[in-house]
């Protein structure tokens, strides 16, 4: 899809923000076909103009962005990019919108005239392009507030069937949060996994994401702060703005470190960094799972995991909102299994079964 081929609707109750966002997109050649000041008029604009992508504010009078996102998914399915305030309640509302089917989110531009505004514009435009290319049909399950345990196809197994001290690294980006949540919710505690989650997400949101995963999973999930040692039954989420490195391994416990090294694949945290350091350090069963997302992050890392004797599972195209990261991983030739979203847990568990 060329820049000129992308049509956008901008929904925000602030005229100032509508102007800022519209100007950013217009400058990049993305056509803003309509703007709206509340959710109801936003839904109508989407119905009328049939855009490729919607940028959606959350807090608006009348119909808010969460309800509007749900209505759009029900009535005229269109990729939605949530523009979220950087605050605790903003993070929670953002995840509620993603439950309704929003593909991704972006921290709302401050609107301040500063040297950082150009970088904000570049990041917003990249997000809009990514979301515009998303397959909304692949994310429709998210709009039903996934009750994954009720619909899980995960095969029942006994604890004695699993290998000892397995480690799982999950990497995802666009469209990933609800898929990660479903995957973790379907992994039994009996598997005794040590889990690292690298989701492309800014600081201020990864902590809330970890809390959601903790509530959805049998595993104890927290945001990495650096220096932790985790064992079986525990999971860490990479903190936004930091790479998550595996810096040591002993007695079945992982030690992790956060670094502010340069972005890799234009992102930080990068899946490749975690996978490559895990491949170097983990002396035990290691599995990588590459989920929906734009770009090639994780492709180099899965080669390292495979070379170290580990296993690789990737999400299939049909259920990926953006089949970028899984496709690039598959193209390396080292992926052992490709599974749809509701079979990813089974795919992971198959890699840690005793022979």
Curated annotation (Swiss-Prot):
Determine the domain of life of the protein's source.
Archaea
Q: Which InterPro entries match?
A: CheB-like (IPR008248), CheB_C (IPR035909), CheY-like_superfamily (IPR011006), Sig_transdc_resp-reg_Me-estase (IPR000673), Sig_transdc_resp-reg_receiver (IPR001789)
Q: Which residues form the Response regulatory domain?
A: 7-123
Q: Could you describe the post-translational modifications of this protein?
A: Phosphorylated by CheA. Phosphorylation of the N-terminal regulatory domain activates the methylesterase activity.
Its primary localisation, in coarse terms, equals cytoplasm
Listed under GO cellular component are:
cytoplasm
What are the EC numbers?
Answer: 3.1.1.61, 3.5.1.44
Chain spans, region Disordered: 139-159
A Gene Ontology biological process in which this protein takes part is: chemotaxis
Residues of the active site are 173, 200, 297
Q: Which CDD domains match?
A: CheB_Rec (cd16432), REC_CheB-like (cd17541)
Q: Where is the CheB-type methylesterase domain?
A: 161-355
Q: What does this protein do?
A: Involved in chemotaxis. Part of a chemotaxis signal transduction system that modulates chemotaxis in response to various stimuli. Catalyzes the demethylation of specific methylglutamate residues introduced into the chemoreceptors (methyl-accepting chemotaxis proteins or MCP) by CheR. Also mediates the irreversible deamidation of specific glutamine residues to glutamic acid.
User: What is recorded about the domains?
Assistant: Contains a C-terminal catalytic domain, and an N-terminal region which modulates catalytic activity.
Write the protein's name: Protein-glutamate methylesterase/protein-glutamine glutaminase
Instruction: Please name the gene that encodes this protein.
Output: cheB
